[in-house]
Swiss-Prot record:
This is Lipoyl synthase. It comes from the Bacteria. It comes from Shewanella halifaxensis (strain HAW-EB4). Its main location: cytoplasm. PANTHER family: LIPOYL SYNTHASE, LIPOYL SYNTHASE, MITOCHONDRIAL. Belongs to the radical SAM superfamily. Lipoyl synthase family. The keyword S-adenosyl-L-methionine applies. Keywords: 4Fe-4S, Cytoplasm, Iron, Iron-sulfur, Metal-binding, S-adenosyl-L-methionine, Transferase. The keyword Cytoplasm applies. InterPro entries: Aldolase_TIM, Elp3/MiaA/NifB-like_rSAM, LIAS_N, Lipoyl_synth, rSAM. [4Fe-4S] cluster 1 binds at C68, C73, C79, S308. It catalyses: [[Fe-S] cluster scaffold protein carrying a second [4Fe-4S](2+) cluster] + N(6)-octanoyl-L-lysyl-[protein] + 2 oxidized [2Fe-2S]-[ferredoxin] + 2 S-adenosyl-L-methionine + 4 H(+) = [[Fe-S] cluster scaffold protein] + N(6)-[(R)-dihydrolipoyl]-L-lysyl-[protein] + 4 Fe(3+) + 2 hydrogen sulfide + 2 5'-deoxyadenosine + 2 L-methionine + 2 reduced [2Fe-2S]-[ferredoxin]. Gene3D superfamilies: Aldolase class I (3.20.20.70).
Amino acid sequence: MNRPERLQPGVKLRDAEKVSRIPVKVVPSERETMLRKPDWLRVKLPASNQRITDIKQALRKNGLHSVCEEASCPNLSECFNHGTATFMILGAICTRRCPFCDVAHGRPLKPDAEEPKKLAQTIKDMKLKYVVITSVDRDDLRDGGAQHFADCIREIRLLNPEIKIETLVPDFRGRIDAALDILATEPPDVFNHNLETAPMHYRKARPGANYQWSLDLLKKFKERHPDIPTKSGLMMGLGESNEEIAQVLYDLRAHNVEMLTLGQYLQPSKFHLAVERYVSPAEFDELKELAESIGFTHAACGPLVRSSYHADLQAQGKEVR
């Protein structure tokens, strides 16, 4: 068996190069075997692209990244056109290689020490009132990137004192307590960490992650910050059953998670995990009813829902589908 070539710093691996490095073999999808996308997943493009262009230019000018672009989110046009974006810090190269995700894998460069200030200024220039800050996984860093998150939050609030900040964090594998100690110095307004799928599907979908670790991260943050909402997101269409997803909802509530996002998995390329089913809007409605009945304060459930989709409205408890 040939060993994978040594990763070079700053080089992005995508598609076949990326998924070839995971323990589960992903067979490229053939066009004739791919499920036809249903009508309810058609995205209406905005009449004007000027706002989209402006946001992209602001990101490029300051060397910043948005997960909207890096992960090929289907809602990019809508969110950018409404003047919202989810900023991705710590670079655009992830140390993990999840085969559902379109973010590049590789050996990241050293974190940009000026990124917190550049991010804060960009947010001020964009006149945003609510921002989501996420990151790639940085298993190469001793604290998993926690201090960089705290630095970004501090700088953002210095220039934008009225802003609300949601963090969508990685799992801080093997360093949860140390990371939470650091984050406690600059806690967000909403703490989000995605479970992504049911535990039976972790080996194929989230190599390197652990279902219980992710639950523990959410619970431990809530124990330290009982007044800050905790949130998690899941995808459907990776081979799970509705019953498996229902059990995940019960597990989240048992770990004091209050907010939920539930959406349809969409295959970024033929080299990624195939979509095994398209979940109907009616099924999402049923799971939303279950979530609300077991105590979630807000559940955004629908085919195009993503963890940061209209996050400001989610935080206000408004309907998002």
